[in-house]
């Protein structure tokens, strides 16, 4: 949707002050907000004499559709699933995932900042509840899951049967574009390895991190970042417990009384990218915690992003091989 007030493209509840734009490739913020909101009221705690009640607030109980996600963002949701649906299950996230249906659009014109193919993602053929393609003004629709079938049944009066000739041609055209993008052939060699201490202790980090402003922009636009903080507010009528996004790039992230949080920006910078490219895939069957959406490439004020990190270590590896 085009938010007139914020003058940016975003995915949010449809309202009268918003215009639908199916041509936009990427929203400014990722659609993870639909399942992991930037801020949500989890509980209200109330005291009545000696009795205390705790009332959950954020449990989603209505079905909804997220329309227009791209393949990279769908993969981002899968990354979040591993975090929030593992043991112990996050019931607030679980409720949204159970009630939400994702309709993903193929990327008609991938942008230069996109590099999803590096992580095995096919922008031409998204894996969601429903995969869709817009071709010559027509919407081609393919349900892939039970949720997708249920949604298709609900809108069947708007649909007609079609062969896949145009869709297959569109897929090929998209893949041909992707092959020509500048970051498509980045190498992930050396990442997601059990023996990672050489990379952890590499002097490359000291050179890379210095332009970092610790603004946190990369973490807030990222579809896979899942760090959050918990805040309690006493309204006088009860204590509200909120969950809100946080950033591992902030100096007070995970601040505790005994002061064991990371003490330097270099350490925080290194942790962010080691988590994306090493720790997460080692603990999740090789799935990387980057999906190549390119938002950090576009939004970092210092042009310091995961592509630069990967390239820096590619160069270091080449120098060693020489």
PLM regions and their residue ranges:
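Single conserved hydrophobic/aromatic residue that forms the stacking wall/gate
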Residues: 1-7, 11
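Active-site helix adjacent to the Tyr-X3-Lys
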Residues: 6, 217, 295, 299
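Glycine-rich, N-terminal phosphate-binding loop and its surrounding beta-alpha-beta segment
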Residues: 12-73, 78
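Active-site-proximal helix-loop elements at catalytic-domain edges
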Residues: 27-41, 177-188, 248, 256-263
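Catalytic cores of enzyme domains
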Residues: 69, 74-214, 219-250
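Ferredoxin-type iron-sulfur electron-transfer modules in oxidoreductases and energy-metabolism complexes
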Residues: 188-210, 228-322
């Amino acid at each position: 949707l085009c938010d007139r007030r914020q003058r940016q493209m975003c995915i949010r509840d449809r309202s009268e002050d918003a215009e639908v734009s199916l041509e936009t490739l990427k929203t400014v913020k990722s659609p993870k907000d639909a399942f992991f909101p930037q801020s949500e009221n989890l509980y209200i705690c109330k005291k009545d004499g000696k009795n205390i009640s705790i009332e959950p607030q954020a449990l989603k109980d209505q079905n909804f559709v997220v329309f227009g996600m791209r393949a990279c963002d769908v993969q981002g949701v899968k990354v979040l699933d591993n975090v929030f649906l593992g043991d112990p299950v996050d019931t607030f996230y679980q409720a949204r995932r159970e009630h939400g249906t994702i309709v993903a659009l193929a990327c008609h014109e991938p942008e230069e900042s996109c590099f999803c193919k590096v992580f095995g993602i096919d922008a031409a053929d998204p894996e969601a509840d429903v995969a869709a393609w817009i071709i010559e003004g027509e919407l081609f629709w393919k349900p892939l899951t039970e949720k997708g079938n249920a949604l298709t049944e609900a809108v069947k009066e708007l649909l007609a049967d079609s062969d896949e000739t145009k869709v297959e041609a569109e897929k090929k055209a998209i893949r041909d574009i992707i092959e020509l993008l500048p970051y498509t052939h980045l190498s992930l060699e050396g990442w997601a390895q059990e023996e990672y201490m050489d990379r952890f202790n590499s002097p490359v980090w000291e050179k890379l991190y210095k332009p970092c402003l610790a603004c946190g922009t990369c973490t807030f636009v990222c579809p896979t970042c899942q760090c959050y903080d918990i805040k309690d507010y006493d309204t006088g009528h009860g204590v509200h417990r909120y969950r809100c996004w946080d950033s591992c790039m902030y100096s007070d992230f995970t601040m505790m009384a005994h002061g064991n949080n990371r003490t330097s920006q270099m350490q925080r910078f290194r942790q962010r990218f080691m988590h994306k490219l090493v720790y997460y895939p080692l603990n999740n069957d090789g799935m990387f915690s980057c999906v190549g959406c390119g938002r950090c490439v576009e939004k970092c004020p210092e042009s310091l992003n995961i592509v630069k990190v990967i390239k820096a270590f590619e160069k270091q590896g080449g120098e060693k091989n020489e």
